Structure formats: C-alpha cells, structure tokens
Amino acid sequence: GAMKVYLRPETAQGIFVNYLNVQKTGRMKIPFGIAQIGKAFRNEIVARQFIFRMREFEQMEMQFFVHPGTEIDYFKRWKETRMKWHQALGFGAENYRFHDHEKLAHYANAATDIEFHMPFGFKEVEGIHSRTDFDLSQHEKFSGRSIKYFDPQTKESFTPYVIETSIGVDRMFLSVMCHSYREEQLENGETRVVLLLPPALAPTKLAVMPLVKKDGLPEKAREIVDNLKFHFNTHYDEKDTIGKRYRRQDAVGTPYCVTVDYDTLKDNTVTLRFRDTMEQERVSIDQLQSIIEDKVSISSLLKKLQ
C-alpha cells in the first residue's frame, strides 16, 4: 500500500529547484550543467551483492540544461564522454559496455546505462538519461511559479530540457576494487597481494623508506617526505625489512616507493620502484616530483578525455 517517504531517492531534485538561482548567480548561459554528490535512499526489498545494491548509497549526479530540440545531440555527446572517463581509469575497454533502454521511463526520450564487468556479470555503474522538461515542468505545475530560462539573444523564455548523468559511487568503488585486487605468484614462489588502483585514485601516491634506521638515512628520507607532502599524499615507513615494506605498500595500492640508501648520501639519487611491474630505477631526488606527479595526478587522467 501507499507509505510516506521522507528520504530523497535521488539528488537530482535539489538541482532542479535551484537551477535558475545557480544560473543567475553564476551568470550562465544554456547549455550549462550543475553537478552534485550526496546521499540517496531506496526502499530496496533485498539489499545484496555486497555494496552493489544498498538502501543508503552515495550518488554523483549532473543535470545538463539544453535548448529543446538539441537534447538528443547532447545525450550522444555525454554518452561518449562518460564512457571515455570510465575507460581512462585503465581497466580495459572490453570491461565496459552500453546498455540502451528499450523501455523508457515516463520522463525520458533516451536512456542508456554504462555497465562494468563485475565478478557477477555486467552491471550498471552509471546511467545517462535525456529527461526532457518533465522535472522542471512538474515543479512549475505544483509550485505555481515560473522557472523558465530567459535567452538574452533570442529574447524567448522556455523550459530547458535536461541530460542527466548519474553514478553510484559505491558501485564505482566496488568496480575499482574488484578489478584492482590481485594475488600474484612470483618467480621465487611467494604470493604477492597487490591492489592495482589507477594511480590517480590511489589514496597514497608515494611511500618513502630508508634502507636502514641509522647512519642518517631516516633523516634524509624525512627530508624527501617533507618536500613532497605538499604535492601529493606521501607516507613514511621504516619498520621491517625493505621487502616487507614493499609488500605492505603493494597491498594498499601505493603506486610508487622510494628507497633511500647509502648511495643517496653520496650522489643525491634514490631507488624508485613501480608497484605494477616491481621494476626499479635510479633517479635524482630533484626529479622525483615531476616524474611522480605526471603519473598520479588527476589532471593527467582528465587529459585523456580531450
């Protein structure tokens, strides 16, 4: 039967009721978008598949406002742009696919899902919808107030059409973790647990380690940490053997490890180790920031979308 619902099922409606305020204060012209992240709630009868389907979850949504008649073109553009974004994470194009909706919701004239190959099959991680003017028209109807956009060039007022992109952050997190976790058999017979996180998403970008806890090596390592910590999240680790420290950082997805040894004190170089291949190279301390920043920054990932 009917029941009262107090918690929002999506973040979108807050954007719709405020879009004109944002447009005016931001002096924006159509087309423009408003993005938001926040909690949403669904009355799921069966919450299942770990964090894939929950009653309380995090959404990242964007509503992109366009002129009526142009919505399908913008829908196609956002469809391709969003797929590029997912593929830029580096999990392989073969693990993503579109699922176009045959049956559309009452408010939509086009809709598709981006699906990711989870361990339990291809599942939706993002939805892209052309919502027409349904939401804004309904808010106008029930509030009795006009929220039409005035075009200063054509001197016309109209209700914009909306393209929506909606990501379930928890599902996105699940897809990243499922694809990143590995248990690798090494040549020496050992097993390595490694989290192959995209460097831009890794919470810690770099671990700095003195080879031993004496002879000025910890002090030199701390000096490197102090210089780099303003540029990206850097961790200092001096406990256990260097091999165990490498394994620890592999398991939490840290892309790079820097080892300070006795040669460092002589020539100001360090050993730089890459998580994915375990390969090591000797680099100057002065080069560390530029080498690592190029690989781990979110801007490097976003450049792939151009």
Language-model-derived ranges and their functions:
Residues 1-306:
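NTP/phosphate- and nucleic-acid-binding module
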